[in-house]
From Swiss-Prot:
The gene is arl-1. GTP binds at residues 23-30, 66-70, 125-128. Its main location: Golgi. Expressed in neuronal cells. Expression in hypodermal tissues is absent. GO terms for biological process: intracellular protein transport; positive regulation of nematode male tail tip morphogenesis; vesicle-mediated transport. This is ADP-ribosylation factor-like protein 1.
Length: 180
């Protein structure tokens, strides 16, 4: 049966992979989305609701959902969990005061049944800001070492400078191709 599905997928093309970009407000989610889509920084405003764009990366098509991260919007994230292949969780590495809140939101999200099979890429963003948490500090602060039975990787990034996004997307694309 799997061979037949692979044959038809080859004939008609693979489906778009669904990726959610999540994280607290101000973490850089929208900047990352448009950096991936158009290759440059665009002026953004706080996302009230969501942005959804198609992103092509190394011959793969992704439907990328950037969900607002404000306190009032986070409870609605779960409305978008169905059929999610991967999560890009963005952390503002320069916002030491809210890393605990980010940890709580991540832990709550990862308990959802609909996300059990989703690959997780954590982006320790804003690495270009002096005094920010290092990649290792973000990893520990989020409690990622305690996660079991989940495909996960953390990357240090600067969305505004475009640094670290290619390694993250390479890893994500590779993981998603292996899951197909």
């Amino acid at each position: 049966m799997g061979g037949v599905m692979s044959y038809f997928r080859g004939l008609f093309g693979a489906r778009e992979m669904r990726i959610l970009i999540l994280g607290l407000d101000g973490a850089g989610k929208t900047t990352i989305l448009y950096r991936l889509q158009v290759g440059e920084v665009v002026t953004t405003i706080p996302t009230i609701g969501f942005n959804v764009e198609q992103v092509e990366y190394k011959n793969l098509k992704f439907q990328v959902w950037d969900l607002g991260g404000q306190t009032s919007i986070r409870p609605y994230w779960r409305c978008y969990y169905a059929n999610t292949d991967a999560i890009i969780y963005v952390v503002d590495s320069a916002d030491r005061d809210r890393v605990g809140i980010s940890r709580q939101e991540l832990a709550t999200m990862l308990q959802e049944d609909e996300l059990q099979g989703a690959v997780l890429a954590v982006l320790a963003n804003k690495q270009d800001i002096a005094g920010c948490l290092t990649e290792t500090e973000v990893y520990k602060a989020l409690g990622l070492d305690a996660l079991r039975n989940r495909t996960i990787q953390i990357f240090k990034t600067s969305a505004s400078k475009g640094e670290g996004l290619d390694p993250a997307m390479d890893w994500l694309a590779n993981q998603l191709q292996q899951k197909k």
